[in-house]
A protein has these predicted regions:
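Conserved Rossmann-fold cofactor-binding substructure of NAD(P)-dependent oxidoreductases
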Residues: 65-86
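Conserved Rossmann-fold NAD(P)-dependent oxidoreductase catalytic core, especially the SDR/UDP-sugar
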Residues: 89, 93-149, 157
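Hydrophobic/aromatic anchor residues within beta-strands of the central parallel beta-sheet
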Residues: 66, 106, 170-173
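Conserved residues in the N-terminal Rossmann fold of short-chain dehydrogenase/reductase
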Residues: 40, 67-68, 108, 203, ...
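Conserved glycine-rich Rossmann-like NAD(P)H-binding loop of the short-chain dehydrogenase/reductase
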Residues: 32-48
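N-terminal Rossmann NAD(P)H-binding glycine-rich loop of SDR-like oxidoreductase domains
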Residues: 9-31
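Strand-loop microenvironment adjacent to phosphate/nucleotide-handling motifs in alpha/beta enzyme folds
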Residues: 3-5, 157-352
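Rossmann-fold scaffold of SDR-type NAD(P)-dependent oxidoreductases
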Residues: 14, 81-90, 131
Length: 352
């Protein structure tokens, strides 16, 4: 991590009380960053985070400032903006079933809220903004994915405007299932096992990309360091079937049985991290892909070159065709998370 880039700088994290915000704090607290601003609408989570900092890291608590607001409210985000150098935009409605039942709430937060953040950033002269997206934005079939796909296009449009003004660099990251983030399935499986109940599986043949929270932060940092305006960054990720993921959790925590409950509203059999169309513009950067922005304007005639043909990529990059982990590989993967490690320690302490 290029900590020197953040020396004496101010970083604003929208949705900062979530799993991503907690992990960013863990990465940055001991560095020479000037200030971290946590922007969110939940005062209880902010209070919990503040007490956690004062209890565990009192020497760094002064670096962190809390702002109560909502990305839906343009003025509240503007109030948090003075003096900000960089932004990690993580505020979102992300639960697929909730967005299916309340799609306009997803529109308000994921689309309009993102536009509010980016307009405020451009007007305030913020240097760099990294926005967090999800694989559900690629070939979307549900309200969560559709709103996030629109969010991405809002990002690209604002990135184009900011670049034309010679100002803020705006880019996007897209990642798959972040293990043990809030609302994800591994904590649910663990809670069900510890309660002595069977774990509930939607479809054992579903596949999902797997990455831990540290990898999510690493992806954002890679994008921060390498982005041109409007770029999309994707981490190369392993995948697992939901059935193997359940077996991996049972191998670590115990087998209390399994109930297959069927797919929920808006769920896919597999997820796509990069579409065929995006692969045409992608650059392999080792552990990551960069998808360059399409910076053409609407005057297409000037982009036509006689004899030039672009061939479509063979396939999308999906959780079905990426490297598939078996049960043992999935066990090793989920053991990279602090959540699973801590849950295992708690179980051992209860037995002692």
């Amino acid at each position: 991590m290029a900590d020197s880039i953040f020396k004496d700088k101010t970083l604003l994290i929208t949705g900062g009380t979530g799993s991503f915000g907690h992990t960013v704090l863990k990465h940055f607290l001991s560095t020479d960053i000037g200030e971290i601003r946590i922007f969110s609408r939940d005062e209880k989570k902010q209070d919990d985070m503040r007490h956690e900092l004062q209890a565990n890291h009192p020497q760094y608590a002064g670096k962190v400032k809390f702002y109560i607001g909502d990305v839906r409210n343009p003025q509240s985000i503007r109030d948090a903006m003075p003096g900000v150098n960089y932004i990690f935009h993580a505020a979102a409605l992300k639960q697929v079933p909730s967005c299916e039942f309340f799609p306009m709430q997803a529109v308000q937060t994921n689309i309009i809220g993102t536009d509010n953040v980016l307009h405020a950033a451009i007007d305030a002269g913020v240097e760099r903004v990294v926005c967090l997206s999800t694989d559900k934005a690629a070939y979307p079939i549900n309200a969560r994915g559709i709103s996030t796909a629109m969010m991405e296009h809002v990002i690209y449009a604002n990135a184009r405007v900011a670049a034309e003004r010679g100002g803020t660099t705006i880019c996007c990251t897209r990642y798959g299932n972040v293990m043990c983030s809030r609302g994800s399935v591994i904590p649910l499986f663990i809670d069900q096992i510890r309660a002595g109940n069977p774990i509930t599986i939607t479809d054992p043949n579903m596949t999902r990309f797997l990455m831990n929270l540290d990898e999510a932060v690493d992806l954002v940092m890679f994008a921060f360091e390498h982005a041109n305006p409007g770029d999309l960054f994707i981490q190369k990720s392993d995948a697992s079937t939901i059935g193997d993921l359940a077996k991996a959790v049972q191998q670590l925590f115990g087998d209390t049985g399994t109930n297959i409950i069927g797919t929920r509203h808006g769920e896919k059999l597999f997820e796509t991290l990069m579409t065929r169309e995006e692969r045409l513009r992608s650059e392999d950067m080792g552990g990551y892909y960069r998808v360059a922005a399409d910076n053409r304007d609407l005057n297409y005639d000037k982009f036509v070159v006689k004899g030039e043909v672009h061939t479509m990529a063979d396939d999308s990059y999906t959780s079905h065709n990426t490297h598939r982990l078996d049960v043992e590989g999935t066990v090793k993967k989920i053991l990279t998370t602090d959540y699973v490690q801590n849950a295992l320690k708690e179980m051992e302490a209860e037995k002692a």
